[in-house]
């Protein structure tokens, strides 16, 4: 596991998370540690964020990474396109910042046969917020429009 990685202790069906010093636990259960605080304003719904991430399992093994793919991810906030806890973590970051976030099952992905996830579990991500763009809808024709995002 990476340095400063949380420990997950299973107690029956419950999981207790033990974090090294420097982590913050929010009221809704989201846990994070900022390794670097970025600059600028916090991103808001409707804005486009570009970021890199590493997703880990509870043992600290990498399960997905934009670094491995060589291309950062981009999405607009507030369109239900991400795991709720991941989006919440992004909204608390500034461009240039890096953060490790521990997402509780309640803020994690939906589970069930139609999803990739068969059971509720804790998710751990390292996130690097690269940039935030403002977006606006522009008319492209009589009945059509598109969303344009600019720095």
Functional labels for PLM-detected ranges:
Residues 1-151:
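Cross-family detector of peptidyl-prolyl cis-trans isomerase
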């Amino acid at each position: 596991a990476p340095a400063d990685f949380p420990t997950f202790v299973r107690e029956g069906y419950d999981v207790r998370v033990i974090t090294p010093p420097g982590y913050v636990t929010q009221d809704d259960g989201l846990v994070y540690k900022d390794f670097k605080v970025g600059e600028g304003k916090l991103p808001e719904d409707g804005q486009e964020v570009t970021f890199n991430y590493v997703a880990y399992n509870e043992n600290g093994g990498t399960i997905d990474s934009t670094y491995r793919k060589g291309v950062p991810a981009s999405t607009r906030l507030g369109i239900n396109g991400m795991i709720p806890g991941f989006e919440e973590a992004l909204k608390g970051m500034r461009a240039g910042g890096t953060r490790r976030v521990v997402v509780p099952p309640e803020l994690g992905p939906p589970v069930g046969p139609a999803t990739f996830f068969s059971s509720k579990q804790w998710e751990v991500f390292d996130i690097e917020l690269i940039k935030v763009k403002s977006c606006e809808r522009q008319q492209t024709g009589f009945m059509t429009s598109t969303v344009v995002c600019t720095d």
